[in-house]
Regions:
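Glycine-rich flexible loops
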Residues: 1-114
Length: 114
């Protein structure tokens, strides 16, 4: 983890490292779901990010956060990683479901008029 935001996913992510290029098929979806397991973020090789949540709002919030985390990793490839111990402490705050929902609420307020 390079950022506080990344601790939301550091212990709760999966990788779909398959050569599958057709992710919209039922079989492809089943393989992705198997890779995802109970995680909230799945990085799909050659496709991008997939997030899930208890609500659509939470899933969107997690996606926005995951995209930001990816951006930080691209911009700071040699950044000093947060230790696992510190990441575990931060994850207690950052990884809860309300965090994803709150990110969505911020996004909605930022982009949409009342």
């Amino acid at each position: 983890s390079l950022s506080q935001e990344s601790t939301a996913f550091v212990f709760d992510q999966a990788l779909f490292d398959d050569e599958e290029v057709e992710v919209l098929s039922t079989d492809g979806g089943k393989r992705i779901a198997a890779s995802l397991g109970e995680a909230k973020l799945c990085i799909l090789r050659n496709h991008g990010l997939l997030t899930v949540g208890r609500t659509v709002e939470e899933a969107v919030g997690w996606f926005v956060m995951a995209e930001r985390v990816a951006e930080v990793h691209v911009k700071a490839p040699n950044g000093k990683a947060i230790s696992d111990a510190a990441a575990a402490i931060a994850a207690d705050t950052m990884a809860g479901g309300l965090t994803g929902w709150r990110v969505f609420q911020w996004l909605r307020r930022s982009l949409l008029d009342n």
